[in-house]
Amino acid sequence: GSLKERIQTLDEKQKSLMQQQEDTLLELPNRPHDSVPSGQSEEDNEVVAEEGDKPDLGNSAKPHWDLADQYKLIDFEAGVKISGAGFPVYRGKGAKLQRALIQFFLDRADAAGYEEFIPPHVVNADSGRGTGQLPDKEGQMYHCTEDDLYLIPTAEVPLTNLYRGDLLKADDLPIQLCGYTPC
């Protein structure tokens, strides 16, 4: 073949090898920081801080679903009707409690020096790959194929991608961001 055909063949081979390399690299997990304790289950988690007095409720403690029903805070049946299992509808005081808790935690983060963001609820595939969501969780993420956008699982995905591709200086760290999304 001609030199042009040979170059074209080698270009295609290089693209294929580069894609194989990227696919392999995307399967490698991120290493946790050395300060992160190692464990096999949630029992191995380390409590970092506790606040306030914990009342001893003894046998009078009720599970959250009973409290939600008793005080009409969450309508599980409406959630099933609208979206299916696992999508509760917060109503009345339950909706107010949800909003108050969100505000409480955002205010705490702000007081600790975190910058608050309201990020988009969908991201492109590069953003999904940038946080390890893709390809690992591809089948578990809602995907709008028309726009090739993915529904985020947490605010972490878009917030982390604010710095995707940037070279950060050690003097600029840590970068403290927070955000709330209903995702």
Model-derived regions: residue spans:
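N-terminal alpha-helical targeting/anchoring segments
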Residues: 1-55, 73, 77
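TRNA-recognition modules of translation machinery and tRNA-sensing kinases, especially anticodon-binding
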Residues: 51-183
